[in-house]
Amino acid sequence: MAVPGEAEEEATVYLVVSGIPSVLRSAHLRSYFSQFREERGGGFLCFHYRHRPERAPPQAAPNSALIPTDPAAEGQLLSQTSATDVRPLSTRDSTPIQTRTCCCVISVRGLAQAQRLIRMYSGRRWLDSHGTWLPGRCLIRRLRLPTEASGLGSFPFKTRKELQSWKAENEAFTLADLKQLPELNPPVLMPRGNVGTPLRVFLELIRACRLPPRIITQLQLQFPKTGSSRRYGNVPFEYEDSETVEQEELVYTAEGEEIPQGTYLADIPASPCGEPEEEVGKEEEEESHSDEDDDRGEEWERHEALHEDVTGQERTTEQLFEEEIELKWEKGGSGLVFYTDAQFWQEEEGDFDEQTADDWDVDMSVYYDRDGGDKDARDSVQMRLEQRLRDGQEDGSVIERQVGTFERHTKGIGRKVMERQGWAEGQGLGCRCSGVPEALDSDGQHPRCKRGLGYHGEKLQPFGQLKRPRRNGLGLISTIYDEPLPQDQTESLLRRQPPTSMKFRTDMAFVRGSSCASDSPSLPD
């Protein structure tokens, strides 16, 4: 790695990125810091991620996202991260780290770029390449050496305490030790590290045939499609007497996922600022969840349930369908000599009073709670259930229906009473335990034995089975498209389908083709 000049050395600012989840790799960090890395005239001087572990702090500091004010503590902190020291880096995180996290020492050019990087990413949530939130936050802090902060590196005089506390030369972490860290010495093919090297550098290496293919796979490099650079279209037009409104800069990943701010979100393992979990739960309860099914029927949802396509956006209005009929004069009729769909649906909706009824006096809680609602609401649901049973839309089998729901409250009471009176498992009943210890099996007895428990009577012998008549018509060839879609299923008792679903259709089961399907059905003699 080339030795930088003095001017560049003065402009270099070192920072520590801590709180990195161990599951993240360099490819994920490239996607996370892509917006800052690909900026023209900016970016990282070096960001080479090497999965350096860090220790969890004993106590969390309240404002650790800010720059620490004790430079001596930072120098002592970085002294633990030398290449010869195997102890992990100890950082002060704002959240109690429960999982293993890592850190990395990076460098940027100039104090302005360092402040911009801290403002963009420090305190934000971690995201992977798929946009999934990860526990913890990104914490970026400026790294200052003790000599750099005090400016008294060559001061010859020392205090009595400094003279008494002897320290070896190899224990003092200097700028030379900082430059020897593996994070600040990336390989030649990645001059700014596996995270900080922009895509244009890899493109130049590809043009020069110097980039191995494995680096593209490891870093998951995705190059933009070739096209015009749009040098003139990217220049904004400045209007006269225009005022620019400063807005908060949004940060995005390489996949276009927005990285949310970390000051208003609660961490997954624990709350960041020591807030009790009850307050966080109250804030979640105060949020409006109008799309949930259990919202007890607000005004707009109630209006939507009573009227079809209230906004006119679903385009469910009936199209004109003409069919000649024999017209019968009827009072209040349309007088048309042909049958229309609109006329049929208008008759289904009822008269004017029924169409304009708001039903505000109907208790809608019966649709959410089985035992809720007043008597009128429960009777309405019962009438709807009976109508569906008559139409065959509801399964009215008594066998499959659960019998004895009261056993949920009474099951096990008899056993508790007997155990209280001294009964144990495997003993008979009575004071002498002379009863049968086990209950009788309900399997019955031998089928040829015609008396006693388990005899069901004579078995009816059928004299003749009726043959199924053959179909005279040709068979209907079904296709996979005949199967109804999930949104076209029949309505349930307490919920209705959206107005876009198909209400009337002939259900035809799809039968996959076989060798027997090619044979044409033979006509009866």
UniProtKB/Swiss-Prot annotation:
Its main location: nucleus. Residues 410-458 form the G-patch domain. Residues 275-298 have a biased composition (Acidic residues). It is found in: Nucleus; Cytoplasm. Pfam families: G-patch. Residues 264-316 are annotated as: Disordered. Signal peptide: none annotated. Residues 299-316 have a biased composition (Basic and acidic residues). GO terms for molecular function: nucleic acid binding. Interacts with mitochondrial MAVS; the interaction is markedly increased upon viral infection. Involved in transcriptional regulation. It is able to activate transcription from the CXCR4 promoter and therefore it might control neural crest cell migration involved in ocular and craniofacial development. Is a negative regulator of immune antiviral response, acting via down-regulation of RIG-I-like receptors signaling and inhibition of type I interferon production. The control mechanism involves interaction with mitochondrial MAVS and inhibition of MAVS assembly with downstream proteins implicated in antiviral response, such as TBK1 and TRAF6. PANTHER family: G PATCH DOMAIN CONTAINING PROTEIN 3, G PATCH DOMAIN-CONTAINING PROTEIN 3. It is linked to GPATCH3 variants may be involved in the pathogenesis of congenital glaucoma, an ocular disease characterized by marked increase of intraocular pressure at birth or early childhood, large ocular globes (buphthalmos) and corneal edema. It results from developmental defects of the trabecular meshwork and anterior chamber angle of the eye that prevent adequate drainage of aqueous humor. This is G patch domain-containing protein 3. It comes from Homo sapiens (Human). The lineage of its organism: Eukaryota, Metazoa, Chordata, Craniata, Vertebrata. The gene is GPATCH3.
